[in-house]
Amino acid sequence: PDPTPDPTPTVITNADEIADEMTTEDGKYEIGFVTDVGQLKDGSFNQGTFDGVKLYAANHNLSYKYYMPANGDKATDEDRYDAMKAACDNGAKAVVTAGFLQEAALTKIAAEYPDVAFFFVDGGSVGANVAGIVFAEEQCGYLAGYAVVKEGFEKLGFTGGGGGTNPACVRYGYGFAQGANAAAAEMGKTVELNYTWQYGNSYSPSSELQALVNGWYNNGTEVIFCCGGNMYQSVAQAAAENDGYMVGVDTDQSPLSETIITSAMKGLTDGVQWGLAYVFEGSFADIAGKSTTLSAKENAVGLPTATWSLKNFTVEQYQAELAKIVNGEITVDNNSEMSNPEKAELSNIKVNFVG
C-alpha cells in the first residue's frame, strides 16, 4: 500500500474541539487507545497519537475510549495487557497502542483477540493482526540539529527519555547530532553537545532534571533538544530562567513555551488516521502483519514551518535540506542503539556524554 499518511479530507481538523471522553448507551467503543507512560495530554507523544484517534472517530461517526494502564510510570506488562483487554472487551474493532513498551502485552493480547485490529505506534508487527507504524525520527532530529547550528548556536544539549533504551528517542538524538555535525562542517566550525539520559526514565518533569539542565544553561549551553513526554516542562523552566532556548519533539510544541524555537515533529496524528482508514474501509490485511515506516518521503517527519521563528536559517533553506533527504542525496543513519553519539566519531561535534 502507499504509506503516505494522507487521511480522507475531514470535517473536523482541530482535535481540541473533540472531547477526550464520550459515553455510549451500550458501553461499547469501536476504537480503543492505550496510552504510553506519562500523561494523556502530554503535548507530545500520547496526545499526538490520541488526536489521530479522536479525529478519525469524530469524522467517521465512530465511538472511542482511551485506557491508561494502571500504576502510571511504573506500569507493568500486566497493567498494559489489562488496559488492552478492557478495550477489546468493550467492543473495540481497532486498538491503537502507543510506545515500544507495549510489545509484550500486545503480543499476548493480539493472539487472544484475532478479530481485533491492533496498531503498534513506534513498534514492529508482533502478530498477524498487528500493524506497526514507525517513523524516521532520525530525519527530523537531523533537520532540527542542522537548523539550530545554521541559526548560529554552537553550544547544544540533548536530554531524552527511557534511559537510552527507547529506539525512537535514540533515533531523535542521534539524528540531532548528525544534523548539527553536518551544518558545523559546512560552516567550518566545531560545535559542542552535552548529552544525557539521566532523570528521563519516567518521561516526566523532575527537580533533578531541571537542576541538571539549569547547570548546562549556566555554563553556556544555548539550546537543548528535549525528547521525552512531559520532561519538556523541566527544560522549558530552566531555559526561561536562563534566557536559553529549546527544541520540542513529536508535535509542534511552540505553543507550550516561548523558549521553544522549533520542534522535531513526526506525523502521529496523520499516521494514526491513515492506519485506521485501512480497518474501517476493509483493507487492514494490506498493512497487518508488518511494520510501515513513515519518513520525510511520505511527508511524515520534519520541522513546523507555520510557526517558524528562526531568523538566520530560513524556511527555504530548510526545505532545500529536507528535499535532499527525500531524494536520497542525504542519508541519515537510523541506528536505534546509538545512545551515545560520541561513539559515532562525528567530525565537527564534540560530544560530552553525561550518561
PLM feature spans:
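A residue-level marker of the well-folded mature domains of exported/periplasmic proteins
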Residues: 3-355
